[in-house]
Amino acid sequence: MSFTHPNFGKIDDNRVIIFDTTLRDGEQSPGFSMNLDEKIRMAEALAALGVDVIEAGFPIASPGDFESVQKIAETVKGPVITGLSRSAPNDITRAGEAIRAAERKRIHTFISTSPLHMKYKLKMEPETVLEHVTKSVTLARQFTDDVEWSAEDGTRTDMEFLLRCVEAAIKAGATTINLSLIHI
């Protein structure tokens, strides 16, 4: 069995796609940061290793993060270059602008789905979160055909609600669903 993906074409069920977050998540480690040239060299090394998807950064986080994602999108060939964004329209637009020049691009958008996060972090009701899922994926699709959606704090989410969120993301056009075991 296989399926068709906008950035990978027809994919066999046994194909493992390597998704690397070093440039985004690795930068959150205390005492570890890279300048622009180091980030580009790291992205080029990941491409040389055969990494399929590089999450290059969180473009809305800072002008420096935007610039590094943009430069990686312009220079690194081969892997899908991804910009991370919350479900906020400004985040998604900024990510879309940052990855514009990539030969293969993706926006990875997320929102918290657990009762705890919805109540205290987002201050949203579940139906509002579902609306954000749909709207965020729909907006991201205006910048790229390849959109990844993630449920932040998904492991503490009611399974029925999580399935509704996944269904909403797929219906809105998400091509990759990410259900992590840890927080983003």
Task: For each feature predicted by the language model, list its residue ranges.
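Conserved, mostly hydrophobic/aromatic
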Residues: 26, 46, 107, 149, ...
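Active-site beta->alpha loop and helix N-cap motifs at the rims of alpha/beta catalytic domains
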Residues: 79-147, 155-161
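N-terminal capping/small domains of soluble enzymes
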Residues: 1-89
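Conserved small/polar residues in nucleotide/adenosyl-binding loops
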Residues: 182-184
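Short amphipathic alpha-helices and their capping/turn segments at secondary-structure boundaries
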Residues: 2-10, 91-102, 167
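Distinct, well-ordered alpha-helical segments
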Residues: 65-73, 92-98, 157-169
